[in-house]
Every structure is written in C-alpha cells, then in structure tokens.
Amino acid sequence: MNFQFIPLIGFNTSMYIALDHEFMSQALTEASKSLYLSNPNPRVGCVVVRDGKALGRGYTQKVGGAHAEVQALADVRANGFHPEGSTIYVTLEPCSHTGRTPPCVNELIAAKPALVIVSMSDPNPLVAGKGLEQLRAAGIEVRCGLLRAEAEALNRGFISRMTRGLPWVRLKIAASLDGKTALADGTSQWITGPLARADGHHWRAQACAILTGVGTVKEDNPTLNVRDVDTERQPWRVIVDSKLETPETSKVFDNLDHSGVILVCGKLDTPEKERCAKVFEARGIDVLSLPNANGKVDLPKLFTYLSQEREMIEILV
C-alpha cells in the first residue's frame, strides 16, 4: 500500500556516519518499547548523545504521558548530565502543537542541542514540517531521513490515520496445509502451534481493537483479550453483528471495566433489536448502528468511525 509522505527536508544518507546509524538504531529500539503502550500516539524513541556517549534515552508513554524527547531529556538530567551542545536522535519529527501535552519542540529548543537528527517527518497535518522549521529557526542544525523506513514500519497505523483517515487493518488467518481452518465436527480448538498463538497475542497487544463477527462469537465464544504479553492495556473488542444476535452471556462481555466492547449493528428497525440495544447499553456496552443500503453493517463507515471518532490506529481482524 502506498502512502503520500511529507517531503523530507535535507534527506541525504551520505551525511551520516556509522555512529549516527548506531544511535538512531538505539532510538528505534526505544520506540519499539511503545508498541503496546502509546496508542493512538505514534511509537517514538529518543537518545541524547555527546562525544559518542549516550547521556539519556526515552520513549513515548501512554496517552497523556511524556513523549520520547521529554523522557530522554529528563533521563539526561537524572544521570547528572546536561543536554546543551549534544546530538539528539529522535525517530519522529518533534511535535509543534499543543494536544494532550505541550509541544516537544519547545523542550528541545530549551535544551540547546547542537544537532537534531530525525528519522521521519510527522504526517500529522498539525505538525507536517513545522517542528523541523522551529528547530532551525532557533539555530539548531537539523537532519532528517536516517533509517526512515524502520521508523515508518513502527508507525504504519499512525501514518494511515493521518494520511487516509483510516486505521491500519491486519487480518490474522490460519489454515492447515490442505486448506482447512477447523475440523468438521468442531472439536479443534486450535490449528496453530504455540509460537503462532504467541505471535497472535503480540498483534492483539499492539492493536487498538480486535474486530470479529457475531458468527465467531456464537461458534467459539472467545474472550478476545491479550494473554501472555507484558502489557496493562487491553484492546477494545468490536463485534460486527447486523441483527444484534450476540448472546448476552458471551465471554467477550467479561471484564468490561478493563476493556470495552463496541457492538456494531445495522438498522434498529424492530422492537426486539431496540430492546437488545438497551440491555447491552445498560451493561456499559457501546451499541453503534451503522447500516448500509441493505441494512447490514457499513464496514467502510465503521473503519472511518474507529479512526476518526475513537482515534484507533491499528485494528486486528
């Protein structure tokens, strides 16, 4: 899938030395620590360096918490150093707008580094090169583009939401070598092995929501939660159910205080459907009516809703 990225300013791989690649790789390692944590914010890492030595490092925390640059600068000071005259490696252009937190670019300017090296520019229209411009206006040298592909790979969902208004959707599917997905008598709980299941929970933990259909809920009665992954955050559970036929006793409704459920239906055009919707809503379950022309769930509208109204960047199906 092709995205339209903001043109990079000063992108030239020849301007970087081996140490630059090493420390930006370390910044990317920091960014990977945000995989299960920072949604819907991008996964960002930062390393502050002077004379070939890392003075501090950080990565973006959960929503409302410190961004990578702020974490790294705090780490520098906690380690007894100062950032003035340093080189700062950061995997995403520093934000220049006030959202849930103040602009990171202000923190960087106040730190007075000599050089800031950035992997990728920010596709958020509120930033879109403004962070780089402000750093340059403050007299700080800026370079952009080092290990850009790696930084983009960590942020496919964020890029998709910013450039297309849609989340990045992953489809997990498993089949045997003969093309089967289950035994005919329904006795097969899994056809995948432990490594594949562990991989599946990694993708669950990374997602903002796990989406499935009412047929799967009826047949398998899944919990749709994350297990065996070191994360406090559980993704939303989204059930596509045109006729509101999801059994009220389904396991997917367990632990609603820890992970929410969105039931997406077609038209609420019968008294029974309206009754079911009220019962679910009374339990704290969100019921969303998004009918298409045939009265079923309008999937394009659903993905737009999840991106724009719920700020979701990655969906696992």
PLM segments and residue spans:
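Active-site ligand-binding patch in enzyme domains
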Residues: 160, 168-177, 181-311
